[in-house]
A protein has these predicted regions:
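FAD-site-proximal beta/loop scaffold in flavoenzymes
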Residues: 90-125, 209-283
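Generic beta-strand/beta-sheet core signal
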Residues: 12-14, 53, 74-76, 97, ...
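Beta1-alpha1 glycine-rich phosphate/pyrophosphate-binding loop at the start
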Residues: 1-56, 82-87, 99, 137-183, ...
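Feature captures the FAD/FMN-dependent oxidoreductase FAD-binding
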Residues: 37-86, 188-199, 206, 228-232, ...
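Short, well-ordered alpha-helix to beta-strand connector turns
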Residues: 47, 69, 91, 125-126, ...
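Rossmann-like NAD(P)H-binding beta-loop-alpha module
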Residues: 1-5, 110-149
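A conserved FAD-binding loop/helix module that cradles the flavin
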Residues: 140, 276-311
Length: 316
């Protein structure tokens, strides 16, 4: 939208391909990568410049970027995987969901990926346990099925009705052979060097917790083992240390670690620096990121037009 209005637009991306989660996070069977690639090519043809392998804050300071551009939009998303402090969590064969999906997508893009070839991020022939109940967990279980896993189990501490992910995705996964272990949570991970089982316990739902959902609590004496050669942790995502990453102490951060913006202008506490998407609202859906992006483009246009008007008035 900004390019259509005549602005020069540059996109800085830390990865070697543009597209973010559309390219590396969402499985190919849900969003074919040639669709994303075609859209990127259309943007390039329209004059949008892509600066790849550029990690803002590490490779290029945000302060320097602010001097180079009249306005900046931060739309980095939330990528920090939530960890689980459980005995055995450091065993080989326990991997973050996004790392697993990224490897799978790179393979689909025709890359030769060591982590896939050596089996560490490949579900073929393995008993796979995915821990989590969101859409990312569903992407992982369905990817594992397509990699010809021996078995795929989704371990979730609440029941089907209280699952945050799409129930349609759950239905698709069940049709493909995924087993859902509802009201169950991991207690520990067993194995010597590599994981061999997930020590789990049955849960029950009690009164509502602070989020308004029924809180899960352990059922004493209900522990059981799930065989596992590959455990995929899909517990959700949090923002990275944004002040540390960007080197801007004046950048206002919410108590959840997301960026604080003026909801009317979509501007952060730094003049001319806007933010949109998951980095503001927390981990959410692509459709919301698209809406936020469109709203941010209009907000940036309004800001730039106002600045141009001031400059014209001063010149008269």
């Amino acid at each position: 939208q900004l390019r259509r209005k005549g602005y020069q637009v540059a996109i800085y991306d830390r990865y070697d391909r543009a597209g973010g989660l559309l390219m590396y996070g969402i499985p190919n069977f849900k969003l074919e990568k040639d669709v994303v690639t075609r859209r990127i090519e259309r943007l390039e043809q329209a004059g949008v410049q892509f600066q790849l392998n550029t990690d803002i804050g590490k490779k290029l300071p945000l302060a320097k970027l602010r001097k180079q551009h009249n306005a900046i939009l931060i739309a980095t998303g939330v990528y920090k995987a939530r960890a689980m402090a459980a005995p055995g969590a450091g065993l080989q064969g326990i991997v973050p969901a996004l790392s697993y999906l990224t490897v799978s997508n790179r393979v689909c893009l025709g890359e030769k990926v060591k982590a896939f070839d050596d089996g560490s991020m490949n579900a073929k022939g393995k008993n796979v346990v995915v821990i989590g109940g969101g859409d990312t967990a569903m992407d992982c279980v369905r990817t594992a099925v397509r990699q010809h896993a021996k078995s795929v189990t989704c371990l979730y501490r609440r029941d089907r009705e209280n699952m945050p992910g799409s129930l349609r995705e759950v239905g698709h996964a069940e049709e493909e052979g995924v087993v859902f272990s509802w009201l169950a949570a991991p207690k520990a991970f067993q194995g010597d060097k590599s994981v061999t089982a997930v020590r789990s316990i049955r849960m029950r739902l009690s009164s509502q917790d602070g989020s308004g959902r029924q809180a899960p609590e352990e059922v004493v004496g209900s522990e059981f083992n799930l065989p596992a050669d590959l455990v995929i942790m899909a517990l959700g995502f949090d923002p990275e240390d944004l002040n540390g990453a960007f080197g801007e102490s004046d950048l206002a951060i919410s108590k959840w670690g997301t960026l604080t913006i003026d909801q009317r202008t979509m501007m952060t506490s730094l003049p001319g620096v806007f933010a949109a998407g998951d980095i503001v609202r927390g981990a959410s859906l692509v459709v919301w990121a698209i809406k936020d992006g469109r709203d941010a483009a209009e907000a940036m246009h309004t800001y730039l037009e106002a600045g141009a008007q001031v400059a014209r008035t001063a010149a008269e």
